[in-house]
Amino acid sequence: MKKLIIGLAVAVCSHSLFAACPSQSKTVFNCTTTNNKVIQVCDAGNTISYSFGKANATPELAITVPRNKVTTYQWEGFGRYENYAINIPNGKTIYRVNDSLDKMSQQYTAGVEVSNNDKLLATVECAANKKVTSKIQGIKLRPEM
């Protein structure tokens, strides 16, 4: 019985569960989607990490990219929509984590758009009734072209 309990503890602890960003990194973005999955971006200084998956489970996708490969879009101060985004590459696939405020209706939206070779594959939205943490505004990354 003791061996079974130890074996289960090792098995559970050996898999990285979805959690807050590691202590040496900062949360740039975090939300729960309409399908109860978590979108998370962490800034560790030299790297940016993106993860996606069910809360309290091993992420379905977790990538870490050198900071100089990640780009950002920052709102330029005019127009109806105040938009901010971070573009995280994984080969030819881009994960565009974004948030937007409609300045007329005050409707806030956030989520991730997944594209491959400039073709949009999926859009996943954060749940409107759940907390969104976004510190994309003002992040020091290369501007997107």
Where are the language model's segments positioned?
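Cysteine-centric segments in proteins
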Residues: 19-145
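Positively charged n-region of N-terminal signal peptides that target proteins for export
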Residues: 1-4
